[in-house]
Amino acid sequence: MDARSDLHHYNPYRVFSRAEWASMREDTPMTLDAAEVAALRSMHDRLDLSEVEEIYLPMSRLLSIHVAAMQQLYYAQRRFLGVVERKMPFIIGVAGSVAVGKSTTARVLQALLARWSPRPTVDLVTTDGFLHPNAVLERAGLMQKKGFPESYDLPALLGFLSDIKSGRRKVKAPIYSHLTYDIVPNKFTVIDRPDILIVEGVNVLQTGRLPRDGKAVPVVSDFFDFSVYLDADEPVLRDWYVRRFLALRDTAFHDPRSYFHRYAVLSDEEATATAIAIWERTNLANLEDNILPTRPRATLILKKGADHVVDSVALRRL
């Protein structure tokens, strides 16, 4: 079967096989070595030099074209308006389901883009930091919907992106701990006018309801100049999630500080059943209701197979 056959519904996209996409790298240099690539890889994600060369280097080349075009537009509009404005950062959104490999993709892009010439400043922020603290979610009865749109402090996230896009100095982003499964009190990442900002999260392409009064209602993706959606079939995502859960049971869950410490003693059978239950109760519902419907809003869609390797790419037509 043609690799693009299951992507026919991605119109208005141009769909490329892996080989076709890889050919668009042209002379883009490889700036990472094997050890650096391994350090960027998340648990159970597959990332090697060939994946970087065939998938991410063409992305890097495409992004360099978009960034250059945006810079030209910025200077042209500045001349048109007759004003001197701060240069706005180029913002890239990375979206997709839990366990699909968003963090790996975001880190690889950050590493590659930071080595462009001249060297731009490239920062990375995850939207996990903009989740409401657990105490707030518990009071609202939303702990079982953590990661759903309603579990985020959307005004804070929109305010952060607005400050970044307007060129403000030293903008703070809250820090989230995957160990404690909660916001770290009084700890922040400081973003100081980067050239490029990568924003990674499950719902970054989420749309809002249309206003009845015609007033503008901003959404996170309004601030993006380019967006990437990591895609995989649901049974594959579930398998990856279960595998990750089992791996964490044997590692991070053994830390007494871990929110999931109680799962460290589960047998393989018990841990698998628990992971599947969490997937079906929370992650599957979020995927079907909130994440997957945003896929057609992405600039670029990377479709992964069961081996974690990208087998086709869909690029939105201009």
From Swiss-Prot:
It is found in: Cytoplasm. One of its GO terms (biological process) is coenzyme A biosynthetic process. It catalyses: (R)-pantothenate + ATP = (R)-4'-phosphopantothenate + ADP + H(+). Its EC number is 2.7.1.33. Pathway: Cofactor biosynthesis; coenzyme A biosynthesis; CoA from (R)-pantothenate: step 1/5. One of its GO terms (molecular function) is pantothenate kinase activity. InterPro entries: P-loop_NTPase (IPR027417), PanK (IPR004566), PRK/URK (IPR006083). ATP binds at residues 96-103. The keyword Iron does not apply. Keywords: ATP-binding, Coenzyme A biosynthesis, Cytoplasm, Kinase, Nucleotide-binding, Transferase. It holds the Pfam family PRK. Signal peptide: none annotated. It is an enzyme of class 2 (transferase). Its main location: cytoplasm. One of its GO terms (cellular component) is cytoplasm. Gene3D superfamilies: P-loop containing nucleotide triphosphate hydrolases (3.40.50.300). SUPFAM superfamilies: P-loop containing nucleoside triphosphate hydrolases. Belongs to the prokaryotic pantothenate kinase family. This is Pantothenate kinase. It comes from Rhodopseudomonas palustris (strain TIE-1). The lineage of its organism: Bacteria, Pseudomonadati, Pseudomonadota, Alphaproteobacteria, Hyphomicrobiales.
